[in-house]
Amino acid sequence: MLAILMVVSLTACGQESVRTPGGELENGVAAIEDAMTTKPNESSSASTTPIDDLRNGSSTDTVATPGDFPDAYNFGSGKISDYSRTAMLQKMPEPAGNNTVLNTAADPANIQVLYLWEEGNVPARTKFTQDMTGYFDDWNFRPYVTAIPVREGVKPKGAVVLMAGGAYQFRGNYTDSLPTAAALRELGFQTFIVDYRLSPYTQEEGALDVARAVRFVRKNAEVYGIDPDDIAVMGFSAGGIQAGELLMHYDEDVTGEALDDSYIPDELDEIPAHASAAGLIYSFYGRLSVGNMDPNWLAEGNLPPTYYVYGTEDPFYRQFQQQYEVISGMGIPTGRIVLNGWPHGFGSDGGWVKDYAAWLETIFTENKG
């Protein structure tokens, strides 16, 4: 999620952000909780702005933890009214042993957790050492992906790779990506949650983690019963920025060598990290807290169809509005839902997931010509 309080030192849009030292986790969490309750600091109410896509959000169709999920994946009701800090900071189970996307066969019938990189071959330019403390992840954290397949007997419509928010200080999987994955699963989508690298790593290093997950899905498209081109990336707040960083600079044929000369490419790097659609949930293309509104910069990414979801009471409402208008004005296919009176950080709540899923299905169909 984005943060009102600056938990990083921001530079101009498109330039690398410099992370603050460890110990900023509490500030990041507090800032996001503030964003979930604080209205925009503007002279006029955002909710009075006429928008064709404006609607009153509802929790009627919000999906709770499915009965077949293991206890470790219990996220509760999925409703923002039941939010808890404990849930927001809960960590997803890590892979068993040294199971990776290369040494383990994809399992389309069960929840599966795999490390994204082989041990000792994780591309990085940040030196995260054992004496650096105060971060959400330990110094020896390895990025991983959690595959949550559709129910048995369901014909998959495509795949969605999800990234939770957390201001690059933590990953709110149990409030963002996991509830949404459960909802999309019920609608026929194979889902993959990426536990990408956080501070002190950079946005660029995290983008390589997302690219790796996309490559894994494309490699195993037949196993998961999907067309390899029917893959979307979506993220919440900082997770959406992470999805955008992939699409702007680290998709297709870009590999770990782009950041780390010592990285040794493997067979997965031969597969393009191509995504056919993007979902930006209370997020935008840019950097933490700063959306990029420059159409020339955005055009460099050859961006796919993009779907925005945000609330009128989000502190970043105006930036979401502005970028949506820029993107749609560039001729990029767009979709949007604006939830009247809703804040930042609502996750899968609000009644937007079905519309997003229907839009994705349309995009995937249109891509086939």
Stretches with model-predicted labels:
Residues 286-287, 312-317:
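Acidic catalytic loop of the alpha/beta-hydrolase fold
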Residues 172-174, 179, 194-226, 346-351:
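Catalytic nucleophile-loop/oxyanion-hole region of alpha/beta-hydrolase
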Residues 321-324, 328-369:
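C-terminal catalytic histidine-bearing segment of alpha/beta-hydrolase fold enzymes
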Residues 10-12:
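C-terminal motif of bacterial Sec signal peptides marking the signal peptidase cleavage site
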Residues 212-301:
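Primarily recognizes the serine-hydrolase "nucleophile elbow" in alpha/beta-hydrolase
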Residues 308-310:
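Short beta-strand/loop motif that positions the catalytic acidic residue
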Residues 69-154:
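N-terminal cap/lid segment of alpha/beta-hydrolase-fold proteins
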Residues 156-165:
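Short beta-strand element of the alpha/beta-hydrolase
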